[in-house]
């Protein structure tokens, strides 16, 4: 499981020109699930996302500490293998039906900690962010 976290002042997701969700200060998280992911990894990733200290002048606060929000965007391209050639290889990406289940579980798990809004699994989305910093972190569990 891999995630790209971006510290944001604002983030929104739209589908076909229609606003689906938006947040103010918090994290925009692009998440990709891999074939070998399981519930244990999911819980570990959720805890790490919520607890990672990337806010404040000296990175002393987490998104939970600042009472921020999360916008969670599903993205099957995150686990792409890019070491060879010029075309990404998606053989490590989880099958869509299973990945949707994992995505729904992740939204629920994150909501146990802080307000989390979701993108639309399987849709062509337009994601807008106002990156704060910029601070962008890649997590892998």
UniProtKB/Swiss-Prot annotation:
One of its GO terms (molecular function) is Ser(Gly)-tRNA(Ala) hydrolase activity. Keywords: Cytoplasm, Hydrolase, RNA-binding, tRNA-binding. Pfam families: Tyr_Deacylase (PF02580). Gene3D superfamilies: D-tyrosyl-tRNA(Tyr) deacylase. It catalyses: glycyl-tRNA(Ala) + H2O = tRNA(Ala) + glycine + H(+); a D-aminoacyl-tRNA + H2O = a tRNA + a D-alpha-amino acid + H(+). Its EC number is 3.1.1.96. A Gly-cisPro motif from one monomer fits into the active site of the other monomer to allow specific chiral rejection of L-amino acids. This is D-aminoacyl-tRNA deacylase.
């Amino acid at each position: 499981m891999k995630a790209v976290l971006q510290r944001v002042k604002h983030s929104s997701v739209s589908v076909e020109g229609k606003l689906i969700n938006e947040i103010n200060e918090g994290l925009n998280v692009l998440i990709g699930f891999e074939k070998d992911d399981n519930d244990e990894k999911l819980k570990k990733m959720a805890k790490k996302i919520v607890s990672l200290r990337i806010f404040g002048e000296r990175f002393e606060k987490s998104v939970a500490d600042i009472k921020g929000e999360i916008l969670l965007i599903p993205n099957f391209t995150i686990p792409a293998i890019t070491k060879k050639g010029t075309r990404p290889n998606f053989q490590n990406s989880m099958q869509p039906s299973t990945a949707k289940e994992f995505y729904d579980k992740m939204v629920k798990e994150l909501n146990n900690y802080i307000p989390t809004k979701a993108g639309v699994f399987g849709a062509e989305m337009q994601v807008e962010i106002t990156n704060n910093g910029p601070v962008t972190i890649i997590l892998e569990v």
